[in-house]
């Protein structure tokens, strides 16, 4: 006897925007209240200061600073949003997601979203935020990607390798 499959409704939204603009801002406006609650749930003092976030970006990913600054501006120059958008010192969250790579003449990358569906943004983004290469992927945290592929065909998938 087999177990019946559970079907969960899922709605995906997609946007295409070469640089952050009104479509990203609409995503921000729709999701920021929930992200703000999550980001500040342990108190704002438990999150890094804005200067620390900026220094971390400058040290680790300086090429992202112009995009981050544009996103911050679109977020109304809200310092709390700027801190969260830096993705530095985020609150702890469960890690997961399964993936499989099938090598061969036509390699295949398969990725599963193993989190609670309520945590899934359900957004597919097509962007060129770097100004160097178009990217299509599953968006998370407003401007990060869980997985995706660039215009040259390089596919990537986020995994934590079994480590929290």
Predicted feature locations:
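N-terminal mature-domain region immediately after signal-peptide cleavage
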Residues: 1-164
């Amino acid at each position: 006897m087999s177990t019946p499959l559970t079907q969960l409704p899922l709605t995906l939204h997609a946007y295409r925007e070469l640089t952050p603009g009104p479509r990203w801002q609409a995503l921000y406006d729709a999701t920021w209240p929930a992200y703000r609650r999550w980001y500040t749930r342990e108190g704002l003092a438990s999150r890094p200061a804005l200067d620390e976030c900026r220094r971390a970006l400058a040290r680790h990913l300086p090429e992202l600073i112009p995009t981050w600054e544009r996103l911050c501006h679109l977020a109304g120059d809200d310092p709390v949003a700027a801190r969260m958008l830096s993705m530095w010192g985020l609150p702890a969250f469960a890690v997961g997601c399964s993936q499989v790579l099938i090598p061969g003449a036509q390699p295949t990358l398969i990725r599963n979203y193993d989190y609670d569906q309520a945590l899934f943004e359900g957004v597919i983004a097509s962007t060129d935020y770097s100004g160097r290469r178009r990217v299509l992927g599953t968006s998370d945290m407003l401007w990060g990607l869980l997985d995706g592929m660039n215009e040259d065909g390089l596919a990537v998938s986020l995994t934590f390798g079994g480590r929290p």
